[in-house]
């Protein structure tokens, strides 16, 4: 723009400001009047048209004060050139803007003896006198309210109404609306009053037609009485024969059915519904047995749950599981286990840890939830104890020294706490127990991978973590172990050649004497497990 020639500047100004439909300079001109443009305008101002000169002079009023101060000399030169112009309007606007670059105010002290101003005012008075005086309002009328405008300009004459639309009164409109609403309501009542029933349940509103015979009952087969003879039925058994039905014909009207026929019609539907209900129960039953509810707790951990869940848990008896085992020093922790190619001689197999099926007397006393799973592996108990042969006497687990465990005799000492432990647990009063946020997260993480722990065992673990120190099996000692999960792992051998598949049991150990709990792993070789 700085290198623009004078002719280019003049053509550019004519394109921007040469429109005759708008005689005022728009505010957007302020962004176009830069310092370079003002310098070029000063050189080509005398060649511009009168309309462009007027808009350019009026556009300087939109410039910011900082821009006016920067371009004061150029603006004063342009205004000085405008005072020498031949157009009277350009001369008058230049006289008004004479003091604007210096003081920022307009020069309104125009001399009355100035012939140019006198000529322009005379032309304006002639133009105003030609117009009707009542239509002329001051420029500030749009900023004044009615009272202030009346005080300034006097009473305003109302506009003359040359014609007026003929409209119905409001009462007539309301009367027509009420009449239409009453007509619609009467039609709806008349339509609903003639419908005594739905024909065949099709949803069609029809009136009862009493002139035509009913098509549901054929004329050729009337109702038979007990005295009417029948060729196809024995004489001693005379019952009314239901009317024959034509399934392909669309029946209308009222159909009379015998009670026996109603039973036969609904029997198939009832049988189908009952069969569907049985199928859904069969599908849902195994899923319910496999699902372990982790949120429910028994009575001795009732403080861990909300009062809404407590009502459903009070009716369930709390029994210790068969996997409570006293701690023994023969447990190998997960961190200290060194796998070797030799087979350990001590641990029995999983088949040997199951209770024998020969003594059938103690099995009816056990709950069903403990019959379905085998007791946890315990390497510390002696499986050769012959004492549990009598089912009536309570058994006490003993560990005699110098006895080598064998895989043929199963350990049955796990069944001993089942006969006498539940009674004192149910009689003890409830305590308000609560878990911290960290304990809740730890329990959730622990139960997420637990595939062997039962619902009572989970409740016992949560109660111990919350602060319960009531030992459900005092006969087994202060330390109780609960089997959480069971899985297999491939561990490398000690010599580094190959790997051995081990059966890993994750065990949760609770010490009721110290209040501490730990979690560790037990390893068993897969060669001993069939």
From Swiss-Prot:
For the keyword Repressor, the answer is yes
Q: What are the alphabetically sorted keywords of the record?
A: Nucleus, Phosphoprotein, Repressor, Transcription, Transcription regulation
What GO cellular component is one of the record's annotations? nuclear body
Q: Where is this region: RNAPII-binding?
A: 189-248
Keyword presence, Nucleotide-binding? no
- Domain comment in the entry: The HDAg-like domain is essential for transcriptional repression, and mediates the interaction with the RNA polymerase II complex.
Subunit comment for this entry?
A: The NELF complex is composed of NELFA, NELFB, NELFCD and NELFE; NELFA and NELFCD form a stable subcomplex that binds to the N-terminus of NELFB. In vitro, the NELFA:NELFCD subcomplex binds to ssDNA and ssRNA in a sequence- and structure-dependent manner. Interacts with the RNA polymerase II complex when it is not phosphorylated by P-TEFb. Interacts with NELFB.
- This chain's protein is named Negative elongation factor A
Source species of the chain:
Mus musculus
What's the name of its gene? Nelfa
